[in-house]
Amino acid sequence: MHQKTPLRVGKGLPRLALCAVLLAALALSGCGSRQTHEEYLIPKGPAVGFESPEFFTEHLAPRNQDLQSWREMAPTVRKSLRYVKSKPAVAVAIDRPGLRLTWGDLERTLLRLQELLPRLDAEPQLFLQNFQWVEVPSGIAYSGYYEPRVKASRTRKPGYEQAIYALPPDMKQYKRRHKGRYYTRRQIEEQQLLAGRGLELAWAADPVDVFFLEIQGSGRLVFDDGTEAFINYAGQNGHKYKSSGRIMREKGLLKRGDIFEQRQWFKDNPQRVREILNENPSYVFFRYGSRGPTGAMGHVVDEWLSLAVDRSYIPLGTVVAFGVNVPDEKYGSLPLRGIGFAQDVGGAIKQRRIDLFCGGSERANYVASHLDAPGPAWVLVAR
């Protein structure tokens, strides 16, 4: 689970001309036999716009999601299947205007996709022949999340002064007495109300890194002795999240307020870091974990495949065809058409909003930090 700043969904995005645009796979390095991002670049391809399922499928390829074959999607499909099979098949998973599905419908869809995976490389038209494409009205607002890496020490020392706290044992009882709220970020950081209680999991080099770790909800600590450890979300203090980007825009400090712009401002203005961060009262606590980012299904999320959704709008276990033009350092923007799986949620993800898990590489950091774009989406339902 993770926190993200809500995005505005417009009435729609204009139909984009079918001009030649470089198409990339968003491949990441360091993933076993997977190829690198550069090896996946295709010379030409249309930008993503509001388009028909037929046009979408024509330009759909597994390499877009760092896969050499659709077969490699099988482990992700199995994760969703385990989840939906735990639900009563006849129970309603979603019932809203334009979409009513039972858990059995979701299971049937996943089983059909699993059955087709060996054939899809040669027969992509099977996506159209075997599934109904239920379009999400007015499209989706897309953003991204990733697995951050935070420099840390197991002990406090010069250069490592920012505490990363475990869940306080008194928080549940305190919340009962104070309308569901614990200490604010300002109280925790300025008044040091948790210091000296043995809750420090580690000490980070940069408070800004820890702040963005809270937004993502999980990541890796890279210790000064060369070791690493997974760190996962354990709980939140009950106060409403307010994004630092919004705070800085309201103060006239930034125009856009994306994460890269924020980081540069914090680097240039270290004396004001606490002032800005403490205006967000929300605070996240952590625990050490044995694996990477874990979604709402209880399984590790998969890069370019796992989607965080509002489960009241798109239920967990849903197969989603999604399209968005993603930011790219070299080319500015590259089209991504993919098949995704609703496997995670986030506190600020509401209705027509999807958060794409981008992985743990530098490229994942760049895409997730800059992605803020509209695009089409369809819920796939087995015919």
Question: In which residue ranges do the predicted regions lie?
Answer:
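N-terminal start and proteolytic maturation junction detector
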Residues: 5-7, 25-27, 40
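Bacterial N-terminal signal peptides
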Residues: 17-27
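N-terminal secretory signal peptides that target proteins for export/translocation
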Residues: 1-11
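Solvent-exposed, well-ordered loop and adjacent helix/strand elements within mature globular domains
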Residues: 31-383
